[in-house]
Amino acid sequence: MISPALIFFSAFLCHVAIAGRRMWPINTLKCTPRVCPFAGILENGVVRYTTFEYPNTIGFACNPGYYLNGTSSSKCTEEGKWSPELPVCARITCPPPPIPKFAALKEYKTSVGNSSFYQDTVVFKCLPHFAMFGNDTVTCTAHGNWTQLPECREVKCPFPSRPDNGFVNYPAKPVLSYKDKAVFGCHETYKLDGPEEVECTKTGNWSALPSCKASCKLSVKKATVLYQGQRVKIQDQFKNGMMHGDKVHFYCKNKEKKCSYTEEAQCIDGTIEIPKCFKEHSSLAFWKTDASDVTPC
């Protein structure tokens, strides 16, 4: 018995015999497999196949952001039909995201109704005095849910201590919280080492705790030095002392080459070390040339 999946084709070619009678050739029939109709293009997806002949199977897959609504494969039947019916690719959506405690929506735009599409994002922000732990942006995933939500926690910082030889100002309230600021300053002749303004961070600590550093009294009475690229008289520029962190370059003599060079000195919290090569010029030794007036090496 011949399968109904095979189609008969007759090749009725009549041949003329020598005796004048007509005869049918022996090989006149051919069977070929049934062919199912073209599966078409799967919108937002792909169809994987080799042929559409019985009993082949075709497969389906959707592009990122879409899911198969229906079967993942279909078979060509003896009747020349696909079974099960061909699927469609439906768009993945996420419901409105839950809002974390002590948080609010910063950026949120739905794609259809109240739902969001795959890879749509939502941005959260924390209420005042609450710090965010985790990513502020969540994304609609291929599974139809949102990536991990952030957490908003209340953060408090201790009252900042007043630095020695300085002062600090901060908001007059019982508790200092996340993002609150404090401003530091120093008394005269002292310089702030660190930022003037600091902030309460999410760790419960201040971003910095600056201190006040003392100025330096110079043992040198008169000298020409380099300060910030300019030649200055040390007795004029630093008559009240050098501030912490200030740098100057003293002129020194190279006796062998009869030329001058410079050595750096820096004031560090009330202390400055004068270069050993420096010799303070005496007005009594008027015949001697000051190192600052000697040709550079």
From Swiss-Prot:
User: Region entry Sushi-like: which residue ranges?
Assistant: 215-297
Bridged cysteine pairs (disulfide): C36-C76, C62-C89, C94-C140, C126-C152, C157-C200, C186-C212, C216-C267, C252-C277, C259-C297
Q: Where is the signal peptide?
A: 1-19
Q: Which UniProt keywords apply?
A: Disulfide bond, Glycoprotein, Heparin-binding, Repeat, Secreted, Signal, Sushi
- Span of domain Sushi: 20-32, 34-91, 92-154, 155-214
> Cellular component terms, GO, for this chain's entry?
cell surface; chylomicron; extracellular space; high-density lipoprotein particle; very-low-density lipoprotein particle
Organs and tissues of expression: Expressed by the liver and secreted in plasma.
Q: Name one GO biological process term.
A: negative regulation of smooth muscle cell apoptotic process
Entry's localization field: Secreted
What is the role of this chain?
Binds to various kinds of negatively charged substances such as heparin, phospholipids, and dextran sulfate. May prevent activation of the intrinsic blood coagulation cascade by binding to phospholipids on the surface of damaged cells.
The protein's name is Beta-2-glycoprotein 1
A Pfam family annotated for this UniProt entry: Sushi
SMART domains cross-referenced by the UniProt entry: CCP
Which CDD domains would you find in this protein's record? CCP (cd00033)
Sugar attachment sites are N69, N114, N135, N145, N205
Q: Which organism is it from?
A: Rattus norvegicus
Tell me the GO molecular function terms.
Answer: heparin binding; identical protein binding; lipid binding; lipoprotein lipase activator activity; phospholipid binding
**Keyword Ion transport set for record:** no
